[in-house]
Swiss-Prot record:
Involved in the processing of the 20S pre-rRNA. Required for survival upon K1 Killer toxin exposure. Present with 1460 molecules/cell in log phase SD medium. It comes from the Eukaryota. This is rRNA-processing protein FYV7. GO terms for cellular component: nucleolus; nucleus; small-subunit processome. Signal peptide: none annotated. The gene is FYV7.
Amino acid sequence: MGTAKQNQNRKKFTREYKVKEIQRSITKKTRLRKEYLKALKDEGYAVPEKEPKTVAKESVRKIKEARAIEGKKKLDEKKEIKKQRKRMQKDELNKQRNEQLERIRVSKEKFQRREDRKKKLTQRTRTGQPLMGPKIEDLLDKIKTDDTYTS
């Protein structure tokens, strides 16, 4: 625990205590300055005006603002590059997906044509004999589509 004096000393090293001390110091300095300026005015002396901001301070401020703006621009550029990358990846995925869907559609159509052709070629009469009409049509189609027979 400790004595009251020890507790008081411990409080001096806390953040809150230091903040209060700084605030007290600032208010004391402003009060003293105000009283001093008032006394000067009462005695008839010229009261010094507030010092204009020096060029160095302004240039430092301008440099800081320029750096902040530059940093913001760089950040915006990075964000834009990220957006473009995401957009490109999304477009690439959509393109791949569309190509895959197209391949699936083509293979289904090809399978359906094969099934239809097989069905036509395996048709039979009532007595079980194969029909020759569809077979002849199929051969004729093959001849028409083959490049060796057409010039």
